[in-house]
Amino acid sequence: MRVLVAMSGGVDSSVAAARMVDAGHDVVGVHLALSSAPGTLRTGSRGCCSKEDASDARRVADILGIPFYVWDFADRFKDDVIDDFVESYARGETPNPCVRCNERIKFSALAARALALGFDAVATGHYARLSDGRLRRAVDADKDQSYVLGVLTAEQLRHALFPIGDTPKPQIRAEAAERGLAVAEKPDSHDICFIPTGDTKAFLGARIGVRPGAVVDGSGTVLAEHDGVHGFTIGQRKGLGIAGPGADGRPRYVTAIDAETGTVRVGPAEDLEVWELTGERPVFTSGVEPGGPIECQVQVRAHGGITDTVAELRDGKLELSLRAPLRGVAPGQTMVLYRPDPDGDEVIASATITRR
């Protein structure tokens, strides 16, 4: 099988490539250049798409004896990920750019080019598992990335490979060291790759500008002024510009955002609780829509935010009734549905949260 491996220059994708070679596949490595200004994006302690990352990936490819290329996806990444991120925050939403990148770049634009060039599959260093076409959680629960892959369609998954999903991260690093790969101890990435300073508010402010509004309490009393709703997200407690807790002495959190009026509402923690969720643009991993209610679990962020639920497709949207409340759920987040399974919880659907 001809396999294209997306190589970031990190340890995970490097071991993924090595395992594809071990399996006897015809392997080619490709590094995605996602920025027209290398160094303005980052992974770990260095820049994503930086010369260092590309060089690390190339050195691994040389050790493995596979061809290696750098493909420029900077324009597509800007349009489909960065601009989408900025526009979502301007609407008062909280998007996950990693979800969007997987959906529109790695398993869409990249996969389409790979298939057009005669490759059978695209392999990545994601921590997730595929068995019989079913997407499951990784063995390493702390590193599991099935959530950010939950938006993939059955057709996209048919051409995807996740070679490291059955192995804990410490063993991946040990394997890289045994193979003599210099990236064995390279730091993991944790922040948004296209915000090198880590200051999301400043990044958004530079692109959205000043859009004044008010911070109000549950009664509508104005507590403070702000420069734009892009500086807030549901569940936020710090940086609200207000004079401490409420009259009852309890902390206050962002509980609602109205981008049209520029209003940010704050309230006590219990105001964050939701028992129902609605999601648009649902994707069913099997490619088949359910015929009735589904007993499952829902996850609303990359790590944590999981509860039992009953999901039902109504008028093209997923309607969820939660068995226990979730807190800090924001429009724009992705909700991923799982079917519990002793062999690894299976992803069955996803959607973008529109109402909480």
From Swiss-Prot:
ATP binds at residues 6-13, 32, 125. Transmembrane segments: none annotated. GO terms for biological process: tRNA wobble position uridine thiolation. One of its GO terms (cellular component) is cytoplasm. It comes from the Bacteria. CDD domains: MnmA_TRMU-like. Keywords: ATP-binding, Cytoplasm, Disulfide bond, Nucleotide-binding, RNA-binding, Transferase, tRNA processing, tRNA-binding. This is tRNA-specific 2-thiouridylase MnmA. It comes from Mycolicibacterium smegmatis (strain ATCC 700084 / mc(2)155) (Mycobacterium smegmatis). The lineage of its organism: Bacteria, Bacillati, Actinomycetota, Actinomycetes, Mycobacteriales.
